């Protein structure tokens, strides 16, 4: 087994790619958010290249808004050694419902991510952590880099320190790279249109079977046009998330 490849127990990733992307309206009027390009390739392509690097062979894309554009793109057989299944999971479905709609295609453990963020996270280590902890829901925790100046001040509101574009924020946030066990479906009411990130995850956390895998490397989401331009600039100057060879 190549050193970067994952354990054969887990080779499936679900990518949530059906949202409207309203904060990136300049681009998403014409295409779904996961098809917005970075370096002349859809961000969805970058995400799949990342998982391909770690040996994933089964990709399930939960499409919705303008999903036909995603299907058309992957009909070109860009990834010859990977099975890519693009499924229409509904225009207005929230994340938990999208997952419910592909449940029958899922193995006991699987990866889940969003179609709008890139990172240099080590998926092999993330998966190993998931199994080592006997977790049913593993979240990648990331420390987002601020693009704004950070201000520190005292009780009188006098500024004591100003840091331009601070590289550190105290709290981890969800990086959107998950490993899940199918036991999580016990916490999803399939009769409701739910956000996975709200009631289901809140209740799973109470079981003591949810863990955070801390990632200190690069991570960046693409929520706005500013984010897209930032990633375009990085692609030209510093390919921080490109861990694959070609």
Model regions and ranges:
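Generic preference for hydrophobic
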Residues: 35, 86-87, 137, 162, ...
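Catalytic-core segments of class I nucleotidyltransferases/pyrophosphorylases
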Residues: 110-111, 118, 124-127, 131, ...
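Short beta-strand segments
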Residues: 60-62, 114, 138-141, 214
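Short beta-strand-to-loop element that shapes/binds the nucleotide-sugar donor at the catalytic cleft/hinge
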Residues: 65, 138-153
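Conserved catalytic-core motifs of eukaryotic protein kinase domains, centered on the activation segment
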Residues: 26-29
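A structural signal for short hydrophobic beta-strand segments in well-ordered beta-sheet cores
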Residues: 35, 151-153, 201, 212
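Residue-level signal for inorganic ion chemistry
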Residues: 44, 70, 102, 116, ...
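Conserved N-terminal catalytic core of the sugar/cofactor nucleotidyltransferase
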Residues: 2-15, 23, 37, 41-114, ...
